[in-house]
Amino acid sequence: MTQSRTHTCNELRLEHVGQKVKIVGWMENVREVGNNFAFVVVRDFYGTTQVVIEDEAMMAIIKGINKESTISVEGTVRERASKNPKQATGDIEVVPEKIQVLGKCRYNELPFEINRSREADETQRLKYRYLDLRNPAVKQNIILRCNVISALRQAMTEHGFLEITTPILTASSPEGARDYLVPARKHPGKFYALPQAPQQFKQLLMTSGFDRYFQIAPCFRDEDARGDRSPGEFYQLDMEMAFADQEDVFAVLEDVLPPIFAKYGTYNIASSAPFTRIPYREAMEKYGSDKPDLRIDLIVQDMTALVQGVDFAPFAEGNLVKAVVVSDCALTRKNIDKLCADVEVQSGNKPYWFRLDENGELVGGVAKFLAERKEALIEALGLKPGCLVGIAAGKKEAAQKTAGVMRKMLGAAVPGHMDKERYEFCWIVDFPMYEIGEESGELEFCHNPFSMPSGGLEVLLKAERGEIDPLTITADQYDLVCNGVELSSGAVRNHDPEIMIKAFEMVRLGEEDVKKKFPAMYNAFCYGAPPHAGIAPGVDRMVMLLSGEESIREVIPFPMNKNAQDIMMGAPSTVEQKQLDELHIAIVGETEE
């Protein structure tokens, strides 16, 4: 039995008419239209070809084959009497002389129709992912992923970066999300960890004398799933540059990403260099988010002073009150109430609203509380008849978050306020170095503890002496955002042991703590480290944006479900007692069935 083919199922055209050919693939569909007459669709990776059955012998073979069996068809190409312009091979058909089963589908019924698998329950899709991926619409996302990764590799290589792989088994990190731990058989009671990111290794590469590093890095974090985050593992374009600063990192990605987004994206327009830069505090004030979608033309305004003294509890003294003004808003009361309910679900805080009608009166929502402030509101907020004003009130963080969610939803819901068909990048810069911890009530690192503080050692010493508030210290850290999705965080690294120790002392950790938690990196920096900077855009999120998908699972070949389970492979699973004994592990407490 030979499985070689002369052509793929997307290759045959009118110029092949009269030729003897052999095609192979899955039997997608059979349509019987009379005695000993049927149309068969054969599908392979590349496309589909119609096979026409016209004799009893061939019909007998086809009737004995279940759909989704793999077959080979040898026959002659002829021109179709009735052509299908929607199909690449729609001008021809193959008249078979021999049909052979290569791999039998043993089931008469499939879990779902292959070409309609996206309509099936997600659990079924994940359980039978190998069938789901036969759907060309599903497969296309994985092909896109491959093309994007290939383009990223080529672009990074052209920019002088070396692709270097870093260890998968490493030490547990005391920072960030939960680690996936791997017991060390030869070292009872000790564990490796799967890396949450190659952070320390890539910085050590810079200290080792490499100049530009990248890899498509697998990262492992034991964290909950959400629409733009898959549990378990994810991949990122990890990069680091020696003797570099923020501007060097920006220059590389501003050159690499726009052409890839324009070529492979659902939209063929991507912002060009330089990307818009927004300081963190400005982003929170103006957009209510540190990952703003700049395709939306709405901004957040402060109306706290305008409602001071208004007899409405959410506007009470001590609360911030934020407004999102939407011009030419034709949303109905029902639409607005539904949108406000959705905002509350996402933000955890109830929003409010009012409208300026065509007669110049405040109506709807909380308008009755604001009647006496009408003129001041119109002037300060720039209101015109037809404007809807969404309101967020509460403590600073709650008010900003609610306003940000409202801005995003109103921008998408009201026509004319969102240029949807483009990719709009921006950098969020000047993140705070420190914050007051919600639980501890004390100074803590806000984001990455290894970022260089803006101003270096001098600014830390000033804070230590009480000359400045440590909460005003910013870090040389930056986020890359596209269409409201955070693609990556990056930073200029703190490569100086003296500055590093001082930064940690600000949060009540000293030199011994740093040496204990990060021994390799600290010791390496003591041997002369170059200034270096890097970033790591998420590959899965990039492909999700490019494909237009709302769930990141649609762009991963074999994703886990929301509960971090691979229901196709049955992972996680129990293991034999012998394996546990070898690892010196005892299961304590109840186990999941």
Spans of model-derived segments:
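Class II aminoacyl-tRNA synthetase catalytic cores and aaRS-like
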Residues: 1-593
